[in-house]
Amino acid sequence: MVRLWCGKLRLWKPYLALATQSRNSWFCSGGGAPSHHLHILKKYGSSEITEMINRYKRNVAGHTLTQNSMVGQYKTTVSPSVAQNVTIETFDSLCIQGNWREAVEVLDYLENKGYAMDLIRLLGLAKLCGKPEALEAARVVHECIIALVSPCDVGARNAIIEMYSGCCSVDDALKVFEEMPEWNSGTLCVMMRCFVNNGYGEEAIDLFTRFKEEGNKPNGEIFNQVFSTCTLTGDVKEGSLQFQAMYREYGIVPSMEHYHSVTKMLATSGHLDEALNFVERMPMEPSVDVWETLMNLSRVHGDVELGDRCAELVEKLDATRLDKVSSAGLVATKASDFVKKEPSTRSEPYFYSTFRPVDSSHPQMNIIYETLMSLRSQLKEMGYVPDTRYYRSLIMAMENKEQIFGYREEIAVVESLLKSKPRSAITLLTNIRIVGDCHDMMKLMSVITGRDMIKRDAKIYHLFKNGVCRCNNLW
């Protein structure tokens, strides 16, 4: 255990540790055990902990009403005929399939029937609900987990914060963090990562500063998260100072992961010469991840020569990282990335659809293309010109800038516009890093359509609103 975040509570005797062992023996016992333990805590002057436990007991007593209220907001649709066959195995099967919607419905049904879901299953469901479209379901799972664990269960609350981070709900995550009676270094990293992934880099640095001011000693994991934060904010100076302080002030020897993070921080901000010099001065042989990162970011910033040089090193260290397209293009890819996927037919705005402009199999191809042409015309009027330096190899062989538009995520944007409610936000998910040209284009599209556009790439969320991205053009 570490000192509590509020800076007031500490561990008195072994009784608080005893309280964390069993929810039934401490908080929910029908006998005199709780009163006995409370008497001991009062004897040693722990009035704050006594109040915390009393508050928790009141929460447990009102759990049924609270949870039913939350679940009631999430409409369940288990039909009577299906309900007869619903078991815990049904819940497990849905979780394995990744079907979080029906899993939450089954969870509600089972708990109404008196079945107490165990913590392991709830944490597994929490991982499935860590996505923007599952926010309401995530809140239901949150209530179920909190009702099951003690106030001092740090791991469960870390998982809840991680879940809300994936849901793009920083407010919910921060509320959980601030209400935690105690935490550990993993909690700090999870909360900082939540800030960073959702575009709040400055808040993450403020949290780290607050951590040190409380007299805590950061470890290597926390420093690595600090470097990731500085990558987002573009604060190379702060990141460099923290890298030096890591060894000089705290005696932490940098690992390969730390060198990789600092390389990415320098290269992301366009300091390619400094990044190359940093890599060449490493006291160990740079890993393939380091060279691959420098390769990708060199091409992002237009230094094709350095990118090609790094690509040669990547190929020597791990030839599987590259193929014919990635060795001549922007980022390393896998063969599975080019497998044609079935067009999405979901009605909600949270989806990512990929298909070529020549793909006539999509049922709405005509109206999508008409909308695409209209948006393209408005983009031209606003001065948008496709930046061909980001597209080489097969795309450049077309010798037509107009076709570049349809070879990226923009068709998915158009499909989302057509299928979502007016003025509602659009969320796009992808497993590759967004390129500068697409980033500029989506800022303009947020102005044209009047929509907030959230794009989750391989690392962070980009929120495009009124022509501005929350990442401040640093990612």
From Swiss-Prot:
Chief subcellular location: mitochondrion
Segment annotated as transit peptide: 1-37
GO cellular component: mitochondrion
Gene3D superfamilies: Tetratricopeptide repeat domain
InterPro entries documented for this protein: DYW_dom, Pentatricopeptide_rpt, PPR_At4g14850-like_plant, TPR-like_helical_dom_sf
Origin: domain of life: Eukaryota
GO BP terms in the entry: RNA modification
Entry keyword annotation includes Chloroplast: no
Record's keyword annotation contains rRNA processing: no
Annotated spans, Type DYW motif: 381-475
GO MF: RNA binding; zinc ion binding
NCBIfam families: PPR
Listed PANTHER family: DYW DOMAIN-CONTAINING PROTEIN, PENTATRICOPEPTIDE REPEAT-CONTAINING PROTEIN
Family: Belongs to the PPR family. PCMP-H subfamily.
Name of the protein in question: Pentatricopeptide repeat-containing protein At1g29710, mitochondrial
